[in-house]
């Protein structure tokens, strides 16, 4: 894993518009990127837990969140934006990979500036909160999403589909008695999404693979991840973006004292 500093991030994304789409994990991806643009410090646990706040690290809540009544339903909305003199990063919360709301986001791109980078994932809500045909619906919606992205976005936009990080069993799930559980659903969903993304020749980062040996960085709820994991996630994203643009990667060795050092060395250990 390459070693980016905050200064490297500001240089790489200079005068770029980056959009992150997805669920609460993707919100944390957005938050770590926003924080990394300003400092080398990691997110705090409290910052990771909060949602819908009016301001986070000099960003602003644009729509939804605490502007409205907070809830955990499928109609929840949250749009955030960080803007500096030379950087623009925006986040849209999704509860489904393709929907009428997603079309409204695409309309934003058509009427306003188009993103230079689009980072997206949606899986857990799709497979956990909708119909009994959730896997078939998910495949259909992935096809619709990727086709619409190619129709709406500029060919110069770097679209990065991230597979979902490894999920654990919920406290209410007894693995041996459960035909459908979150862990297995995520594995199936990742297989479908990677297959469809490849068919549409989109860039794909397999975050399930990258974090397969980092389960100690996952939170007790079996879904979310700690600040060290999210900084590693950001480093992987930035490495891919730089390579895609033909930009030389930063040189240097990660200090052994860095929390990321242990996480990065896990990537090179054989899976037991």
Each model region followed by its residue ranges:
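Alpha-helical cap/lid subdomain in secreted, periplasmic
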Residues: 88, 92-272
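Intrinsically disordered, low-complexity segments enriched in polar/charged residues with Gly/Pro
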Residues: 5, 65-68, 209-210
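A short acidic-Thr-Gly-centered motif at the start of a beta-strand
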Residues: 4-13
């Amino acid at each position: 894993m390459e070693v980016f500093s905050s200064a490297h991030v500001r240089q790489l994304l200079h005068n770029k518009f980056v959009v992150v789409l997805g669920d609460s994990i993707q919100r944390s991806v957005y938050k770590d990127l926003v924080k990394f643009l300003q400092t080398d410090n990691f997110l705090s646990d409290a910052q990771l837990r909060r949602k819908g706040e009016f301001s986070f690290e000099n960003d602003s809540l644009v729509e939804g969140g605490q502007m409205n009544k907070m809830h955990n339903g499928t109609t929840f909305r949250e749009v955030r934006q960080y803007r500096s003199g030379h950087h623009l990063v925006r986040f849209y919360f999704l509860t489904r990979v393709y929907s009428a709301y997603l079309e409204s986001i695409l309309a934003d791109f058509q009427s306003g500036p188009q993103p230079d980078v689009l980072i997206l994932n949606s899986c857990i809500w799709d497979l956990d909160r909708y119909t009994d045909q959730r896997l078939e619906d998910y495949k259909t919606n992935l096809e619709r999403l990727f086709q619409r992205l190619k129709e709406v976005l500029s060919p110069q936009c770097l679209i990065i589909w991230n597979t979902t990080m490894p999920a654990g069993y919920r406290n209410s799930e007894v693995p041996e008695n459960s035909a459908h559980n979150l862990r297995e659903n995520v594995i199936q969903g990742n297989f479908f999404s990677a297959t469809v993304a490849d068919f549409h020749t989109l860039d794909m980062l397999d975050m399930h693979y990258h974090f397969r040996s980092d389960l100690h960085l996952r939170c007790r709820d079996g879904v979310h991840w700690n600040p060290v994991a999210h900084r590693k996630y950001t480093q992987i994203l930035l490495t891919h973006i730089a390579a895609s643009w033909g930009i030389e990667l930063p040189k240097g060795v990660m200090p052994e004292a860095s929390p990321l050092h242990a996480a990065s060395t896990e990537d090179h250990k054989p899976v037991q």
